[in-house]
C-alpha cells in the first residue's frame, strides 16, 4: 500500500497519509489555520504553489 509524505519548503516532514484525500484534508486544515482564502483546485498544484514537496512510498 502506498503512503504519501508531505514536506514544507524547508523539507520539514509535515505528515504521512494513506490516501491523497487524507493529504488534501490536511492541506485544507492548513489553509484554514493560516487564513489562506485561495481556491485549491488540484492538490498537487497547490503543494507546488506554496513551495512544499511530496513523496510516495510504495
Predicted regions and their residues:
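Short, mixed-charge low-complexity intrinsically disordered segments
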Residues: 30-58
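Generic alpha-helical propensity signal that fires on short helical segments
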Residues: 22-24, 35
Amino acid at each position: 500500500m502506498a503512503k504519501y509524505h508531505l514536506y514544507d519548503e524547508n523539507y520539514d516532514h509535515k505528515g504521512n497519509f494513506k490516501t491523497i484525500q487524507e493529504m488534501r484534508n490536511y492541506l485544507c486544515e492548513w489553509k484554514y489555520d493560516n487564513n489562506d482564502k485561495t481556491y485549491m483546485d488540484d492538490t498537487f498544484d497547490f503543494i507546488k504553489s506554496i513551495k512544499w514537496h511530496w513523496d510516495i512510498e510504495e
